[in-house]
UniProtKB/Swiss-Prot annotation:
The active site is at H235 (proton acceptor). This is UDP-3-O-acylglucosamine N-acyltransferase. One of its GO terms (biological process) is lipid A biosynthetic process. It comes from Helicobacter hepaticus (strain ATCC 51449 / 3B1). The keyword Lipid biosynthesis applies.
């Protein structure tokens, strides 16, 4: 595919190129600056990587406007406001097929279903979706169009999956939440969970996640949320639009987040807590209270991020000072 055509196709609705392509060539892939060839494209997003640009053999490179005069003459500059986004958009044109169907699926030519897939009663799967080997889909599940369900995923009954959803290998959608009542003698009596999980459009769920079904109603993952590997989401949680949950985040039951929340690795919440829009929680942050919108937090116990960083620096100084006395 010609470079110009690839950019027009990938950028539609997201970005615009701010300069003219003088050297149009047949593009065959993307690569880092260090290893890119003359038929590949790369990007540079920060000035500190300029040394890699000087020695690169890439055919073209996405750059910010202020770096235009730094591009060597043998590389076609591609000026955009967000090179990282440009690279991400173009990468979708060169994604390798994740699964090749070896036998014809009897249900429809537009759905690929791999070996050893188990599909329950009253299941609907949208066109162009891919169900990879060893997936289990329970009764009354709905899966939208252009979804990718990777090997060994289990989707429990009544779950609703939107369009363009990716669920990576080993994730469990809709298992029972952790809920028990307790007798006077100390026995734990299971509370049956009769709700469901709803995952809206354009969500990506990493490998080995667990998203628990609701006791009543639904556990909801809203549009555009991106969830890393090894994340636990408890019953009746609501994850807001375009939220990012990094690996090993844990949300206790009935936690709700606003839109565009970011939680770093191993951060966690207590139950029945609300995290406001655009909140950021640093890795291992322990959220035990509601957090207002547009704030940043960290630490255990949780405190505002600036205060936590000051506390951490002071603590290190104190430890260093005391160690000299030993």
């Amino acid at each position: 595919m010609l470079l110009s055509l690839a950019i027009d196709t990938a950028f539609k609705g997201y970005l615009s190129l701010q300069n003219t392509i003088e050297n149009d060539f047949e593009l065959n892939g993307i690569a880092p600056l260090e290893s890119a060839t003359p038929t590949q494209i790369s990007y540079i997003d920060q000035d500190k990587y300029l040394s890699n640009l000087t020695d690169s053999q890439a055919g073209a490179v996405f750059i910010r406007p202020h770096l235009l005069d730094k591009v060597p003459s043998h590389i076609q500059p591609l000026v955009v406001e967000n090179p990282h986004l440009a690279f991400a958009l173009l990468s979708q044109l060169f994604a390798a097929p994740c699964f090749t169907l070896t036998t014809q699926n009897p249900r429809t030519n537009n759905i690929q279903i791999g070996a050893n897939v188990v599909i329950g009663d009253n299941v609907s799967i949208g066109e162009h979706s891919i169900i990879m080997p060893n997936v289990v889909i329970g009764d009354n599940v709905s899966i939208g169009e252009h979804c990718k369900i990777y090997p060994n995923v289990v989707i429990y009954r009544d779950s609703i999956i939107g369009n363009r959803v990716n669920i990576h290998a080993g994730s469990i959608i809709g298992c029972d939440g952790f809920g028990y009542a307790h007798t006077a003698e100390g026995k734990h009596i299971k509370i049956e969970h009769n709700g469901r999980v709803v995952i809206e459009d354009d969500v990506e769920i990493g490998a080995n996640n667990t998203i628990d079904r609701a006791v009543f109603g639904q556990t909801l993952i809203k549009q555009g949320a991106k969830i890393d590997n090894l994340v636990q989401i408890g019953h009746n949680c609501v994850v807001g639009e375009h939220t990012l949950l990094v690996s090993q985040v844990g949300l206790a039951g009935s936690t709700t987040t606003g839109r565009n929340v970011i939680m770093g690795g191993q951060a966690g919440t207590g139950g029945h807590i609300h995290i406001g829009d655009f909140v950021q929680v640093a890795g291992r942050g322990a959220v035990g209270k509601n957090l207002p919108p547009h704030t940043k937090w960290g630490g255990h116990p949780l405190m505002e991020l600036n205060e936590w960083m000051k506390f951490y620096v002071s603590l290190r100084r104190l430890i260093k000072k005391d160690s000299k006395k030993l």
